[in-house]
Amino acid sequence: MLRIGIGGPVGSGKTALTEALVPLLIEAGRTPGVITNDIYTQEDAHHVRRELAGILDPERVMGVETGSCPHTAVRDDPTMNLAVGAEMLERFPDIDTLIYESGGDNLTLTFSPALADVFVFVLDTAEGEKMPRKRGPGITDSDILVINKIDIAQYVRTDLNVMESDAHRVRENRPVVLTNSLTGFGVDELHQQIMSQWNGARTELIG
């Protein structure tokens, strides 16, 4: 079972990235389910169902209303997410990949190892090129850092080269992927990185 955790600030493009990633997982022969997190609603779950209509069974998308800070539900006490994940697997035992999308949060967000095997943290260029230099566990400790919305960098006066270079520096050259989730640019690379990270971790456990 591959469990992917996707986190990042509000509006960074986590939901769009999830929606772009699911078809690639299916094309690669995997059977995904999606669990979204919102504080008070299931808006992201509704959005994923609409956008992936005809691609992913809408019943394989479930929402968690956390009622608390997003990081609490995916790091400090992931009980609600674990319960929803167990429910989904009971209903659909063929699922071999779960994507947990966190609600929007700050740079301290991380995922509990009990919930995610591969942790993807998403920034976007509209937040400014300085964001990687702010560090925070989401930026420095995630398995993969995504810099999303590269298409608007020039319009928000973000030097993409600086942002990418700083990201590699503070992460000590751990994976950084540039994406435009609306066009799909970079999402294939993200998919490959996720599988590489997961397969590497499994090899270490077996070894």
Place the predicted regions along the sequence by residue:
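Inter-motif core of Ras-like GTPase G domains
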Residues: T110-A126, R135-I147
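Short acidic active-site motifs
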Residues: L107, K134, G186
